[in-house]
Amino acid sequence: IDTGMSDTEIAGKYHHPGSVQPEGYAVYEQLENLGIKCSEVTDIIFTHLHWDHVYYLDRFVNADLHVQRTEYQFAVNPIPLYYKSYEYPVLGLKPQFDGRSFKLYDGEAEIFDGISVYPTPGHSVGHQTVVVNTSEGQYHCCGDLIFTYDNLKPVPEMHYDITPPGRFLDIVDEWNSIVELKKRAKSQEFILPTHAPEMIEIVDSKRVYGN
């Protein structure tokens, strides 16, 4: 699910100065630690196609790629405000997904037995959450729908049932998608946001979720 960000040099030069990918944390390095070669990966499901979720695709030469149709259509022809997010060629960059074919989905779908997706737009036009069934329960890999678990908390004094993140494309979609995520997930433990600080501990622990 997703392939992560670029190296530190590209991230700092073209995207967010100060962004760092620690040595050993690139997706291909993490897979190598698990004894998996990128060429052995058969499928990649993307929550969305922002630059920090699609890097190193050139290493996954045998993988089928899965994404929502609306996300793909916007990624290849974004408005100027999102040129950087999708590394649009006019900036002198080549999108990681350039020249690759995708299997496109229109809404909720089962991709494999025990692995499904449902739309969670808001952070991007066609953002989706990936659900993986395990012996422990269904884990919701929600990409950038939330950035921290605090986004799931209500704010009673403001009558908010969530605390939405500050970065979004459409706040109405974002709000409704987070509410939907909370409704579907068994508990917070079963929600895995890409950028939550706790994810580093999860990666370092090399935990395997269920079976």
Language-model features: where?
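Active-site gating loops and adjacent loop-to-helix segments of metal-dependent hydrolytic enzymes
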Residues: 10-13, 18, 148-166, 208-211
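Metallo-beta-lactamase
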Residues: 22-36, 40-52, 64, 69-119, ...
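Active-site metal-binding loops of divalent metal-dependent hydrolases
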Residues: 3-6, 49, 70-71, 123-124, ...
